[in-house]
Each structure stands twice: as C-alpha cells, then as structure tokens.
Amino acid sequence: MTENHYLLLTPGPLTTTKTVKEVMLYDWCTWDVEYNMMVQKVRAKLVSLATKEEEKYTTVLMQGSGTFSVEAVIGSVIPKNGKLLVCTNGAYGKRIVQMAEMLHIDVVVSQTEEWEPTNIVEVEKILQQDKEITHIAVVHCETTTGIINPIVDVCKLGKQYGKVTLVDAMSSFGGIEIDIAELEIDFLISSANKCIQGVPGFGFVIAQRDELLKCKGQARSLSLDLYDQWETMENQNGKWRFTSPTHVVHAFYQALLELEKEGGVRARYNRYYNNQKLLVNRMGEIGFKPLVNEKYQSPIITSFIYPEGNFEFQQLYNELKRYGFVIYPGKISKVDTFRIGNIGDVHEEDINRLVDSIAKGVVIG
C-alpha cells in the first residue's frame, strides 16, 4: 500500500494510520456473525471510553456523517410537545438549530460570538424564564474556530433545572477525557472519523438507557430513528436495520485497538495538546496569531488570523499542498482566518515540517 499523498491537518476526515487503511482491503457481509460480533465489540468499547458506569449507557451506531447522528438524536429524543435550548457559537450549533426548525421542534437559542465560549449566566437566565424547555444541547468543541465550550457547567445547569442534556462531542470524544455519567450527559454524539482516527461513514450516539427507552415511537424519520436502530442492534446481536458501512466499521475497530495501544484517551489528548502548543508557538515565531483565547482553545484545531500585509490564503493552501499538507479555510464571517488541525496520525515532527513549509511560502508585511 502506498503512503499518504497528503498529510491532512483538518478536524476530520483526518490522516489515518496505514494499518487502519489496510483492514479496508477485505470485504464483509452485513449478515455475517463475525462482522456483527465486531459491531457489538465496537459498541461496548465506546461505552467503556465514555464512562466507568457502563451499565447505565448504551451505544447506537448510525450510517452517514456525524450530522446524521445529530439529526437522529434531535428528531428522536425530543417529543412533539418538547422544547430545545441550543447553545451556539459556531456553525455546528447553528446546524442543530436548523435541524430543529426543519423538524418543527420548538427551539430557543443562547448565542455568543464565535470566539467566545457559551455564556453560562445567559443560559441560566433562559432556563429560569422559559419553563417549557425540556432539552438542552451544546457543542463541546466548536471546530468553526477550535473553541471549547463549558459542557460541565452547561450539563450541571441542565440537570439543576431538570432538562435532558445533549452534547455534540463530534470533534472531542476520544481526544479529550469525558465521563458522561459524572457530567450527567444523556446523549453524546460523535463520529468515526474524528479523534478515534477512523474513516468517514458512520456516527454514533452514547445514550443513557432510561432516556433512550423514552424515545420509542417519537422519531420524525424512518432511517434516522434512533430507538429502532438501537433496538435492532440489541435484539439481533449487532445487526443494523439497513446496509452498514462494513469497511468503515472494520477500520474503526482497528482504530479503537490503536487508541488502546497508544495508552487511551489521556495519552492521545497529551499528543494532541503538545501538537497544538507547538503549532501556536512556531506559528507565532513567523507572525501568525491565534483567534481564540488560550484558556478556551481546544487541542483539536486552531484558527489563525490573517496577518497584515499581502497575504492570500489560496496561495498558502496551494503552496502547502505542494509540500504535502492540506489545511482548512476559515469559517467565520467577522474575522479573516484559516484553520490548522492537529488530530489524526500527526506528530510533533509533522508540525515542525508544516511550519517550516509555511515559512518558506509566505511573506508577511
């Protein structure tokens, strides 16, 4: 197998190991007992990554991108008379709002600037004033900028006011330690192609069992029915309702084994954290400043402000691609930025090579 032609410095899809890619060379039948046993192992491993209180939680795998799993939760968990509070400071919080509106779910928004974390004082004020709210949703790592939101405080408030808590941990789960039982998270959503370092093709929901049982018959979609998907997997030993991405599941299982071999979530977090600190320090040396305040910055992806002078992102992008790197454009409207991810099979030597390449290709001032 050939090596990667580019190093993806993006928040997912990301650079995977050669061994993760190699397992996709084999074909699997969706009805095969061995394959379905692998699905069950994946489900169990995800719960064990999420909490020590494993008996309280279960995992549902859902075909499609991570957004499909988020929409499965929004469309299945909130009853017809429910009301959703969404904390948003970026594109992915806004997407949850859009889902709720499309599904005719009553929704209220707590919005902050994209470079500022969720405002806990405002969230509590909304919860105090609006007694009809039944559910609260927050994005843990908002990859629009790379900011980390205070899910501990949001979930604590949610439970203080008796709400069901939904956390989009798409770009953080597996890379930042989270105990969903301690945080009283009822539904956590993530994806195969993020910090666990698999490839795109399915998302997953780690759900509090008692809350999941309440979802029966509530779904607003056939294919995105979270309860029915879970019930089939439970009763038919890992069977999916509809065709599953067999190669992707096998790659994800391999990625889970490699996460364990690396030393678990804490070890992976340390690698990502060191990558991010090195990136910011080295970029600072050549004139680039991060958008997000250091105390709110995630170890997942960093937004850099365009420097003053004759700077063109597309030129930088093309130059870096020539050197073997792919980065992300910015995603906010008020400040010109670009983004560099440091998750995936990325190490400090890769960050150093990247910044050396940027220094060669960019003239600032």
Swiss-Prot record:
It comes from the Bacteria. It is an enzyme of class 2 (transferase). InterPro entries: Aminotrans_V_dom (IPR000192), NH2EtPonate_pyrv_transaminase (IPR012703), PyrdxlP-dep_Trfase (IPR015424), PyrdxlP-dep_Trfase_major (IPR015421), PyrdxlP-dep_Trfase_small (IPR015422), SP_NH2Trfase/AEP_transaminase (IPR024169). Its EC number is 2.6.1.37. The modification N6-(pyridoxal phosphate)lysine is found at K194. Its cofactor is pyridoxal 5'-phosphate. One of its GO terms (biological process) is organic phosphonate catabolic process. Keywords: Aminotransferase, Pyridoxal phosphate, Pyruvate, Transferase. One of its GO terms (molecular function) is 2-aminoethylphosphonate-pyruvate transaminase activity. It catalyses: (2-aminoethyl)phosphonate + pyruvate = phosphonoacetaldehyde + L-alanine. It holds the Pfam family Aminotran_5. Coiled coil: none annotated. NCBIfam families: PhnW-AepZ, PRK13479.1, transamin_PhnW. Homodimer. Belongs to the class-V pyridoxal-phosphate-dependent aminotransferase family. PhnW subfamily. Involved in phosphonate degradation. This is 2-aminoethylphosphonate--pyruvate transaminase. It comes from Bacillus thuringiensis (strain Al Hakam).
